[in-house]
């Protein structure tokens, strides 16, 4: 699906339309619908950890979230090898409104959200043993870690 960018992705202020493709329940691809860059791997944060934040009023207005029922929150992941070294930006989530095909990036204040990081390793949540068995990587919640 192609989304109109209402509040730009940091560093890519001139990008107006982005295409979102689902890979599986955890991963998605997002790329410029009108050019070659940028392209990102996104993750569903809710499959990895408890994740919650307040959406700023300006973003609610831009995306017309008052009556929206079909929303997606995703975070950008920087891919590394091995995969458990890949990092997730939990401080700048992307919000997608499927009702009107708009999207925006929200930049959270780290002082208000001290448990979120710009570059948190997915290895904190990623079950490497399951991945090595050839199965889809099983998310590991903090409560499951020893």
Curated annotation (Swiss-Prot):
Keywords: Bacterial flagellum biogenesis, Chaperone, Cytoplasm, Translation regulation. It holds the Pfam family FliW. It is found in: Cytoplasm. GO terms for cellular component: cytoplasm. The keyword ATP-binding does not apply. Gene3D superfamilies: BH3618-like (2.30.290.10). Its main location: cytoplasm. GO terms for biological process: bacterial-type flagellum assembly; regulation of translation. Belongs to the FliW family. Acts as an anti-CsrA protein, binds CsrA and prevents it from repressing translation of its target genes, one of which is flagellin. Binds to flagellin and participates in the assembly of the flagellum. Interacts with translational regulator CsrA and flagellin(s). PANTHER family: FLAGELLAR ASSEMBLY FACTOR FLIW. This is Flagellar assembly factor FliW 1.
């Amino acid at each position: 699906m192609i989304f109109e960018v209402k509040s730009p992705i940091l560093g890519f202020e001139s990008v107006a339309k982005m295409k979102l493709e689902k890979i599986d329940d955890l991963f998605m691809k997002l790329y410029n619908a009108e050019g070659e860059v940028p392209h990102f791997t996104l993750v569903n944060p809710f499959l990895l950890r408890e994740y919650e934040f307040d959406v700023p009023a300006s973003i609610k207005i831009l995306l017309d979230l008052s009556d929206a029922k079909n929303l997606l929150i995703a975070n950008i992941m920087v891919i590394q090898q091995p995969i458990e070294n890949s990092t997730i930006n939990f401080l700048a989530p992307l919000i997608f409104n499927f009702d009107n095909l708009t999207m925006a990036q929200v930049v959270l204040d780290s002082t208000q959200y001290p448990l979120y990081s710009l570059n948190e390793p997915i290895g904190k949540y990623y079950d490497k043993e399951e991945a090595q068995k050839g199965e889809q990587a099983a998310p590991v919640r903090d409560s499951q870690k020893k």
